[in-house]
Amino acid sequence: MNNQGGDEIGKLFVGGLDWSTTQETLRSYFSQYGEVVDCVIMKDKTTNQSRGFGFVKFKDPNCVGTVLASRPHTLDGRNIDPKPCTPRGMQPERSRPREGWQQKEPRTENSRSNKIFVGGIPHNCGETELKEYFNRFGVVTEVVMIYDAEKQRPRGFGFITFEDEQSVDQAVNMHFHDIMGKKVEVKRAEPRDSKSQTPGPPGSNQWGSRAMQSTANGWTGQPPQTWQGYSPQGMWMPTGQTIGGYGQPAGRGGPPPPPSFAPFLVSTTPGPFPPPQGFPPGYATPPPFGYGYGPPPPPPDQFVSSGVPPPPGTPGAAPLAFPPPPGQSAQDLSKPPSGQQDFPFSQFGNACFVKLSEWI
């Protein structure tokens, strides 16, 4: 059967044929729709086994429309898929190219592709198993599986190159294939136009596929750029989302966290009493706020309830629950002892300086 462009008028491509279907049974089936002048089933050159597709040519080109209007078609217990063969010079260009695909132009000898894209490959399927499976559609000349550059493990998709285009047509016609118990998607791979297309992801060479440009099918292997880090369960977490209830992770898009609480400083002078261990009774412990975040600073005329009594004379302040030291009135408690430097509260946040010898 000739494959010249003018000879494709009135011709059907028939895919999904059973392995037992012969040219005689194929011709006999389609003869009910009109006179068949030519019929062929494509076979493997080595094993002479049917490759599962063929071509039928009618004397009257109008018979093609009759066949298409009579779908579905079943032959030898299997659903077959007849499609019209449009001469290459008459193939319409796409008005809107799909994402990640170039505008389709009349194909030349140099732009013909015998390559298919295979997505959703099982993790336990290697190049040998892929080649063995796709050999049923024709001679496989190359198998390329895309690997993660860092982890050196398959990313779940790859490319198969056949010896001829008829093998590509047959493989793509099935669309979904069952490989090692998993549904695998097969699409035709088109060579990119290097002048009009930006380079694809690493490992894609010059071949494009929608799955390489979109995360919808889950084959890109990379999460969106707005996602950072891992949750304790190993799942991707959006930037700023809390992980385990501990607030925003440090270094993931937020400012450095401030100290969780202001230091409490206690100064002592030599005396008969040992230095205090920890904080004096009744004085503050760190406030119960989450990691790295404390309460907002109080206004200048207010004091936080950190357990440290406010200076006497402050409006609204409660009276002290203990007497002042000998020789000093309650009004003088807000002043630093003589000979001591006065440190403003604003310099150390909510810290309070207390000289223990004044309270003993």
Swiss-Prot record:
Region (Disordered): 73-116, 184-345
Protein location: Cytoplasm
The keyword Repeat belongs to this UniProt entry's keyword annotation: yes
InterPro entries cross-referenced by the UniProt entry: DAZAP1_RRM1, DAZAP1_RRM2, Nucleotide-bd_a/b_plait_sf, RBD_domain_sf, RRM_dom
Family matches, as PROSITE patterns: RRM
One GO-annotated biological process of the protein: oogenesis
Chief location category: cytoplasm
Residue ranges with Pro residues bias: 271-301
Record's compositionally biased regions (Polar residues): 203-231, 328-345
Compositional bias per record (Basic and acidic residues), positions renumbered to this chain: 91-112, 184-195
Single GO MF descriptor: RNA binding
Domain RRM: residue ranges: 10-97, 114-191
Biological role stated in the UniProt entry: RNA-binding protein, which is required during gametogenesis. May be involved in the actin-dependent anchoring of Vg1 mRNA in the vegetal cortex of the oocyte.
Subunit structure: Component of a mRNP complex, at least composed of DAZAP1, IGF2BP3-A, STAU and VgRBP60. Binds to the 3'-UTR of Vg1 mRNA. Interacts with profilin, a protein involved in actin assembly. Interacts with VgRBP71.
Protein name: DAZ-associated protein 1
Name of the encoding gene: dazap1
